[in-house]
Each structure stands twice: as C-alpha cells, then as structure tokens.
A protein has these predicted regions:
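Short, conserved recognition motifs on repeat-domain binding surfaces
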Residues: 1-416
C-alpha cells in the first residue's frame, strides 16, 4: 500500500451514508461501509514522494485503525484491501474496537415514509445523516443491548427485527403465538456477549374483566442458542396490569405495571420482577410482589445505565395526574427507589412544549430525553452528574403534528 505525500490532501466521500449534508437515498440496504471513498491529491508541481507502509505488521495497522473515530473507521475500510480486511476481521471487532462502546449514540427519526434519520455521536458531539435497513415507526417497541437493537411492530406484532444499526446487519424472528388478543405488550432484550447469545422477552396483557380490574398476563421468552420460544408463563393479576415497558438486567426481567383500581394516584405505577434463570413464576404476579413507584409518574421508562436498573419519568401532580411538574431519575436499590436527580427547571423550559408524554432512552453512562414534538435532545451523564443539550440536529419539523422519537445504543462493529 502506497501513500502519496503532498503538502495537503482531502477526502471525498460522494454518496456516503456518514454525511453531514443531505442524506443519500440511493444507498438503501447497502450498509455503512463506504465504497466510494477517494483520496484526492492536490494538483501542483511540487515533488511527491511515495511512502509504503506495507512493511508494517498487521498489529500496527490494527492499532492505527482502532484509534480512529467510528465514522472514520468505516471510511478507512475503503482506502485499501488490507484495511478493509482488518476492519471486517473478528479479531478487530472483538478486541481493538471495544472502545467504541464506551458511550452510547442516539438515533432520531420521525413519522416518515423512509427509514432515514439522524445519528448523534456523543463522543464527537456530532450528528450524521443515517439510514436504517428497514422502516421504523414511533409506535414500535424498541430495546437496545450491547450494540444490537430489537424492534417489534406494535401494530401487527408479527415480526421482531434484531439489528446492528452501525453495520446494518439484521435478522428477523416470528413473534410467539398469543393465547388471546393483547391490549398491551412490552419488549425486553438482552445480549450475552460472552456466550454469543441473546434473550428476548415479550410480556402481554389481556383484559379479563369488564371493569378492567382483572388481567391475563403471559410472559414469552426467546433463547437465541436454542432458536426457539419457551412455553409461556401464564397468570392473572388483580388490580394491576403490565403496560408497554420492561427491561432485562442481570437475567432479571423487570416489568412496569399500572394500578387498575379507580381513584389510585400515588401508587399508580409499580414494578414486578421475574428471574429468567430459575423460571419460577410463583408469586410473580401477586400484589404483594409489586414494588411501588417513587411517586405519581407519567411516561415512565426503564433502562439499564451503569449496570443498574434506572427509572425515568415525569413527576405527576397528585391533583392533576396528566400534568407533570418535572422529570426525575431514580435507581432501584433492592426494593426501593433512590432518587438520583431531577431535571433543572431551566432545561424543562428549554423544551418549550414538553408535556406529560416524552421519549427517554439510556445506556452506558448516558440518559437521553426528547420531546415527541421537537428535535431538542437533553442528556444526563450519570458519571459526571451533569445535564447538557445535544448539538442542534438538522432535522426540521415539516408539519405541526409531526412526531419525533429516538433510541440510544452502543456503537459496535460486530453483530454478536
């Protein structure tokens, strides 16, 4: 491999998906490994010397590539055959590129007919035009884990996509059969990298009484090693029902439940747990097993941040449950919630039209909060205990009722 040494050069990336300009709609399904990268030399009369780095051992090449930002790694993969082989090698993706997962990235999308959006690099604090390999709607259930993201169409509940957004590799699973028509369903997803497997959980709730007090609950577990859905755990709940929020953390399934008794405000939300190692359903759905929420909540979300179960939600008013007075973050400590922080009022006001419905997603050290009505994204760093805004996204609102949403994930180069 030869590099031509000149006074200066530039990289031209025509049609690249990793672009700071308008997205290229002609690269659907082509992945993010850029094929059109060109090294453009300045046309001048100065003497140029060719320098070969082919004599360098592979481990030096790997160390050079592993120091690059993620977007630059994809571009470098197209410079020469050797670098392309290294970037795609299992050794590089499993070892040298582990630093890529230190900070989660955020993908923002809208109610568009195209699978396009913007991807936020939290390390470089930069947005990229980005495209998923399939169309995702804001009503879909989305669950990330270790670089992979699970998507479930909540309208049809027929298919689940397991995708690496960075490499655009994905596989599709059929949903397990349901014993009835589910009113609510919750998706959870967990990757075990040491054993190269993943687990999917779907919790379904079906109405069992006209007064909405009794609910039939089914828990479906998929093991990728066996490539099969286990027999569902079935049971009933009185006075509580699962919603659309669940999480897997350290082989424990956490399910956010809602009180179905009238005039209940303070304890409107709760949490139940199910051990995925023992598969013992006894007592899981009993009322005495419910862990009360820290306060009246709206738009509660569970997420795994710093290897802990974290709850993010709007802090409701006791007299007006649909109105929030702020947004809080809590960590589960045993069977109690410990408050970490509340969003400062200046940031609440910065959202403008932030109401009781908003999106939140977290992983690694970062928690992302976004209003469904706009593109502003606020980040809370659990490590530094600081709030800060994302750089302004170039996505614009095209009509008044347009809905924006997003999710975070760890950028990785390998599928498993």
């Amino acid at each position: 491999m030869l590099f031509w040494v000149t006074d200066s050069f530039s990289l031209s990336v025509p049609g690249a998906s990793w672009s700071d300009d308008e997205s290229d709609t002609n690269r659907k399904g082509s992945g993010v490994f850029l094929l059109n990268l060109e090294l453009i030399e300045n046309d001048n009369n100065q003497e140029e010397n060719s320098v070969s780095i082919d004599i360098l051992p592979d481990d030096i090449h790997e160390r050079i590539l592993s120091r690059l930002p993620l977007s630059a790694i994809f571009k470098a993969a197209c410079v020469c055959k050797k670098w392309n082989q290294i970037v795609h090698s299992k050794k590089f993706t499993l070892t040298d590129a582990n630093f890529l997962s230190e900070k989660t990235w955020y993908f923002m999308f809208t109610s568009s007919a195209e699978p396009v959006g913007y991807l936020y690099d939290s390390g470089l604090r930069k947005w990229y035009n980005f495209e998923l390999p399939f169309l995702v709607h804001h009503t879909w259930k989305i669950a990330p884990s270790c670089g992979l993201v699970s998507f479930m169409d909540d309208e049809t509940c027929k298919k689940i996509h397991i995708c690496n957004p960075i490499t655009r590799e994905y596989e599709t699973l059929k949903n397990p059969p349901s014993p009835g028509f589910p009113v609510y369903s919750a998706l959870a997803f967990s990757v075990d990298q040491s054993n190269s497997k993943y687990t999917i959980s779907i919790v379904r709730a079906m109405q069992a009484s006209e007064d909405f007090l009794s609910w039939l609950v089914s828990i479906h577990i998929y093991n990728s090693k066996e490539k099969t859905w286990l027999p569902p755990v079935m049971g009933g709940m009185e006075g509580w029902r699962p919603g659309d929020v669940s999480l897997i953390c350290d082989n424990i399934l956490y399910i956010l439940v809602f009180c179905t008794r009238p005039n209940e405000v303070q304890n409107f939300h709760g949490l139940i747990t199910y051990n995925l190692e023992t598969f013992n359903p006894i007592g899981v759905l009993k009322e005495e097993s419910v862990i009360s929420a820290p306060c009246a909540l709206t738009c509660g979300r569970l997420m795994k941040v710093q290897r802990q179960v974290v709850l993010v939600g709007g802090i409701g008013r006791a007299d007006r449950p649909g109105v929030i007075k702020g947004i809080g973050i809590w960590v589960l400590n045993g069977k109690e919630w410990k408050e970490v922080t509340r969003m400062p009022q200046k940031f609440v006001q910065g959202f403008g039209e932030l109401d009781d419905v908003f999106a939140s997603s977290g992983g690694g050290d970062l928690i992302y909060i976004q209003s469904y009505g706009g593109t502003a994204v606020l980040i809370y760093d659990m490590d530094t205990r600081q709030w800060f805004w994302c750089q302004k996204c170039q996505m614009h609102k095209k009509f008044p009722l347009e809905i924006f949403s997003g999710f975070c994930f760890e950028p990785r180069l390998q599928f498993m």
